[in-house]
């Protein structure tokens, strides 16, 4: 039921908050399955036709902030499957009044999550490795 709800979500969503326009997408504004890594070349972030102040995305689980020609691209990382360090939830705060983006890391106990992985799918070794980094 929850998975069906997630699968039914749109690839993108435009929202306004604090007088700023946000485009929310998973992989990139042009492809929900595209990986945009922090070390990608500048042309990888050259999207035309974006009508937003901020583009928020995920997919890679790596935190990044990149200024593009007309917008700021932000990947806060991952709350549950951070790629840089296990046991840390990555997230950010965007201050729409002064356009300051503050990247955050919050440690959490991975033991209950690993136990759930082992209980519900003992073949999920990759996720357990990610969580234990």
Identify the role of each PLM range:
Residues 30-32, 56-67, 81-86:
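Active-site environment of divalent metal-dependent phosphoester hydrolases
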Residues 25, 54-59, 73-77:
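Active-site neighborhood of phospho(di)ester-bond hydrolases with catalytic His/Asp-centered motifs
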Residues 1-54:
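Conserved catalytic scaffold of divalent metal-dependent phosphoesterases
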Residues 66-133:
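Acidic, His/Gly-rich catalytic cores of divalent-metal-dependent hydrolytic chemistry
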Residues 10-14, 62-63, 89-91:
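Short, acidic/polar N-cap/turn motifs at the starts of alpha helices
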Residues 32-33, 37-40, 60-62, 123, ...:
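Charged, low-complexity, helix/coiled-coil-prone segments
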Residues 9-11, 60, 78-80:
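Glycine-rich, charged/polar anion/phosphate-binding loops
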């Amino acid at each position: 039921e929850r998975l069906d709800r997630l699968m039914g979500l749109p690839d993108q969503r435009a929202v306004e908050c604090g007088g700023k326009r946000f485009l929310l997408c998973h992989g990139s504004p042009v492809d929900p399955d595209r990986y945009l890594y922090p070390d990608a070349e500048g042309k990888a972030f050259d999207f035309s036709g974006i009508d937003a102040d901020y583009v928020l995305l995920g997919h890679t689980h790596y935190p990044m902030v990149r200024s593009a020609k007309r917008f700021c691209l932000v990947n806060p990382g991952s709350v549950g499957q951070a790629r840089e360090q296990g046991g840390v939830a990555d997230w950010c705060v965007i201050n729409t009044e002064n356009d300051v983006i503050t990247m955050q890391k919050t440690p959490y106990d991975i033991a209950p999550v690993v136990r759930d992985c082992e209980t519900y799918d003992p073949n999920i070794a990759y996720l357990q490795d990610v969580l234990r980094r």
